[in-house]
Amino acid sequence: MVKGLYDNFLANVEVSEAITDNVIECWDKYKTNSDNTIDVTSTSTFDGLQSANALELLDFQEDYKFQGALNNLLEIVQHLIRTNLHYYWVHFVEYHSGGYQGIHNHAHNEDYSLILYLNTCKGGQTHFESGVVCTPKKNNMLVFQATLNHGAKETQSWDNKKVLVCGMRISK
């Protein structure tokens, strides 16, 4: 992991609506395929739907819009932190009303994480142990070191909160 300048790195960037729309279109199309989702009881997700690693799911591997969106997101992050990265894990989380994410981090698998908000909703703020709180707003993307403990507050909207979560490793 990069030390010094990027310790406790956290950025909130807006991405183009076209990228977000391509991602949400794919999720909405493929989430009904039970091969693409997992049982959330072994995760930090409560009252929601979660995909398996989309990098390993045929529906997502073969979707050129999704792959293009992933490439665009990776370029944005690499430009932001000035480091070459590659994806290790990519998954979707959709929270129902009352759904939330327990405090966790991604340090066991990744160097950097991103959360792309696929829609705007009430509640469901991403919160960090440092006290930083980010409200879900469509097209906003959080980029942070995987060591940062974070969670998602309870979703209070009738519209499900939808996010894309990506884990990246530094390319050697």
Question: What residue ranges belong to the model's regions?
Answer:
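Non-heme Fe(II)/2-oxoglutarate
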Residues: 1-83
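Catalytic core of non-heme Fe(II) oxygenases with the double-stranded beta-helix
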Residues: 75-172
